Amino acid sequence: MRFRWDWLRPVVLAPYVPTIGPVHPSVLTEDLFTDTLTAASTDRWFLRYDKDIRWSEAKDEIVLVEDIVHRPTETLIPTLSQRGAGTVKIHLYGIEPESVAAATELAQTLAVEHGAAKARIVRFLGPEAPDGRGTRIQLQNFRTAICPAPDGPVRPFDQWPAGVRGTFAGFAEEMTSDGFAFLYGQMQAGKVGPVLTAVVSGRVVGAIGPMEIRPDAIGTPQLMPQYFGVLQEHRGEGLGRLLWRAAMHWGQVNGADYQLLQTEAGGPSDRLCWSEGLTSLGFTYWQVA
C-alpha cells in the first residue's frame, strides 16, 4: 500500500513517524511513512536513517502493514515490538471522537493475535496545545542558534586523567536507570563517539553522550540524541546546563544542522530546553488500550 498525503497530513499534529520517532518538519513526507512499510517487509532491517541503528543489529519494532487503517479523517498505524513480552501500539492520527474506540479495539485484537502482553494507543498533540502532556518533541536549530563553549568542569571523557576516568564506572552504576551502564559498556567496546563529562573533586558526577552526527532521511547532518544525566546529589549546581551547552557547542562546531530531543513535559530537561530557546514541535503520549 501507499499512504495518501492529502488524507494523512491534515491529521499529523506532531512530526512523528511510527518505528522511526520524531523527524524534522522539513523531512516529514509520505515517503517516510512508506519507508516504514518497506522496512516491515525485510528481516527486521534498519532504515539507513533510523537513530536506533547505533545500538542493535536488528529492528525490534515493525509496522503491521496488513492491519493499517487509512481513510480521509483518520489513519491507524499498528506496530509490534518483540522486546520483553511484546507490545502492540496503535499510532492514532485522527481527531474524530470515535477514533479512540477504533484504535482501542484494533490494539486489543492485534495483541491477542500476536501474543503481546501490552496494548497501547499512541496519540499526538500540536505544539500549541494548552494541555500538552507526555513527551515533548524539541528542535535545536544550529543554523540560527548561538552555542559558545561553556566555562566549567566539562570535558570529553578521554581528556581527563586516568584516575578521573576510573570513576565513570561508579557513576554509570548509580545512573543505570538512565542508561549509563549500557553506555559505559559501549564506551569500553569503543563503539560510540565522545562522551562529555562533568567532574567535581576528581569524580565524574554528570555526563552527556555519545556525541555523534548522522544524516537524516534527506542527507542533512543531524546530531543524534544522547544519554544525559547528573548524580542526584549534584543536581541544582548548574552542571546539567553546562553539559547541555557543551553538547550544543560540540554539535555546532562539528557541522550538525539540528538536533531533535524528546523531554518529559514539565520535567527538568523540558524546562532546561525551554529556557535554552529550543522550539517545541508537539507532544506524544500513550494510553493503555
Q: Which residues does each predicted region cover?
A:
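Residue-level recognition of the GNAT/N-acetyltransferase active site
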Residues: 95, 231, 235, 264
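Conserved active-site tyrosine of GNAT-family acetyltransferases
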Residues: 130, 269-274, 278
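Acyl-donor-binding surface of acyltransferase catalytic domains
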Residues: 2-8, 76, 80-158, 286-289
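Conserved acetyl-CoA-binding loop-helix of GNAT-fold acetyltransferases
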Residues: 99-111, 227-230, 236-249, 253, ...
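Short amphipathic alpha-helix that is part of the acyltransferase structural core
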Residues: 1-49, 138, 145-182
